[in-house]
UniProtKB/Swiss-Prot annotation:
Its EC number is 1.11.1.24. The lineage of its organism: Archaea, Methanobacteriati, Methanobacteriota, Methanomada group, Methanococci. It comes from Methanococcus maripaludis (strain C5 / ATCC BAA-1333). Keywords: Antioxidant, Cytoplasm, Disulfide bond, Oxidoreductase, Peroxidase, Redox-active center. The keyword Cytoplasm applies. This is Peroxiredoxin. The active site is a conserved redox-active cysteine residue, the peroxidatic cysteine (C(P)), which makes the nucleophilic attack on the peroxide substrate. The peroxide oxidizes the C(P)-SH to cysteine sulfenic acid (C(P)-SOH), which then reacts with another cysteine residue, the resolving cysteine (C(R)), to form a disulfide bridge. The disulfide is subsequently reduced by an appropriate electron donor to complete the catalytic cycle.
Length: 217
């Protein structure tokens, strides 16, 4: 089972867009990707999730991030389901869906729980442009995902790459609003510099270990 900080396993997958090599396909394009699993095609909760992901697809792309789905259904089932969504709900699913019909990748990624049958749970993997797994979330089969939180997670991880941390409920934190946290000082000189930066107005803060600032683009 993989963990945060590990490289995404190298695999070749069959998708609704043809064969893809992961994570190579996205690394070569210099893109992040969000891989998410769903329990099964032609199921109500999964259908609502796919529509919700598609409606935010442009938002993910603006973050240099692609989407790719996965279940243990066959590719023919994926194709018919995507056609059904277009016909009945008038939504074009533009991102690929992996047909992991033997469950090999799902098992490797810890998407199948022995307590939840043979179908995948609702997993989310955020992978950066180097192929490193940056975040993993698991939802039970009976609970649909919050897509705004997945978008927020990608934004927060990309903000972390700029050297900042993000507070609870960012960018709507009760105290800091959209401001971001400067990592705590780790020695006495840095502590002194932080206090001086807060005093001069270069940073804001409650103490030397709790400093924050506006996010600089």
């Amino acid at each position: 089972m993989v963990v945060i900080g590990e490289k995404f396993p190298e695999v070749e997958v069959i998708t609704t867009h043809g064969k893809l090599k992961l994570p190579e396909h996205y690394i070569e394009a210099g893109k992040w990707f969000v891989l998410f699993s769903h329990p099964g095609d032609f199921t109500p909760v999964c259908t609502t999730e796919f529509v919700a992901f598609q409606k935010r697809y442009d938002q993910f792309r603006s973050l240099n991030t692609e989407l790719i789905g996965l279940s243990i259904d066959q590719v023919f089932s994926h194709i018919k389901w995507v056609e059904w969504i277009k016909e009945k709900l008038d939504v074009d699913i533009e991102f690929p869906i992996i047909a992991d019909d033997r469950g090999e990748l799902a098992v490797k990624l810890g998407m199948i729980s022995p307590y939840k049958g043979n179908n995948t749970v609702r997993a989310v993997f955020v992978v950066d442009a180097t192929g490193t797994i940056r975040a993993i979330i698991y939802y039970p089969q009976e609970v649909g995902r919050n897509m705004d939180e997945v978008v927020r997670l990608v934004k927060a991880l990309q903000t972390a790459d700029k050297g900042y941390a993000t507070p609870a409920n960012w960018p709507e934190n009760d105290f800091l609003n959209e401001k971001v946290i400067v990592p705590p000082a780790n020695n006495m000189d840095a502590r002194k510099n932080r206090l001086e930066a807060c005093k001069s107005g270069e940073l804001e803060g409650y103490d030397w270990w709790f400093c924050y600032t506006d996010l600089k683009e």
